[in-house]
Regions:
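Transition segments tied to proteolytic processing and entry into folded domains
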Residues: 18-20, 30-195
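Intrinsic, low-complexity polybasic segments
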Residues: 3-8
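Bacterial N-terminal signal peptides that target proteins for export
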Residues: 9-21
């Protein structure tokens, strides 16, 4: 026997349980991703990098190699060479994956670039002399400018404030890595580590 309003209470309870389950799954996915990476300090990234560059993404192109694998070339206009070998006014970063026609090849821990984005990248040069982002998504910092002050802040999955919609924010809070990080402080730490 059911009473008036009982069905709506049951549906409300199911919605809450479904939402809780979805939240737990998203947090678990974020924790799984973080667990698959050992966080690297800024100093470690700087010490291992062949170059550290502050720049703007001006172009991206996706191609296939002879083996049929998809790869992406990311072209940066260099604003400042913070450390390492100078390579002129541009830097081309190569990484596996991308979108080519209807084919998508991606890794959740691969850095994501977009045209127009201001970034700081820690790169190593492979045997073909191509720049590759060091430590996957740990070697790329997004630069954001505060609207009122213009102060440049940086972040990656393990350093700086998390994006509001980033499921890894839970992990960053758990690891105590939710402090703001300015571009100036990042540069200072890179230069100090390079000495």
């Amino acid at each position: 026997m059911s009473f008036p309003g009982q069905a709506s209470n049951l549906r409300g309870g199911m919605k809450r349980r479904s939402f809780a389950l979805l939240t737990a799954l998203l947090a678990g996915a974020a924790l799984g991703q973080a667990a698959s990476q050992v966080p690297l300090s800024i100093e470690t990234l700087a010490a291992k990098a062949d170059a550290v560059v502050h720049g703007t993404v001006v172009r991206m192109s996706c191609q296939r190699d002879d083996g049929g694998r998809i790869f992406t070339k990311v072209h940066l206009q260099i604003i400042e060479q913070m450390n390492g070998r100078q390579r002129g006014g541009t830097l081309v970063i190569v990484q596996g994956g991308g979108v080519l026609g209807r084919r998508i090849a991606r890794s959740p821990i691969q850095p994501t670039y977009r045209v127009g984005a201001e970034v700081v990248v820690f790169v190593v040069f492979n045997s073909r002399g191509e720049a590759v982002t060091l430590g996957l998504n740990q070697g790329k910092f997004d630069v954001m400018r505060q609207p009122k002050t213009g102060l440049a802040m940086v972040r990656n999955p393990f350093h700086g404030l998390a994006k509001r919609d980033d499921p890894r924010a839970v992990v960053k809070r758990a690891l105590g890595q939710t402090k703001p990080l300015t571009l100036a402080e990042l540069k200072r730490r890179v230069r100090r580590a390079a000495k």
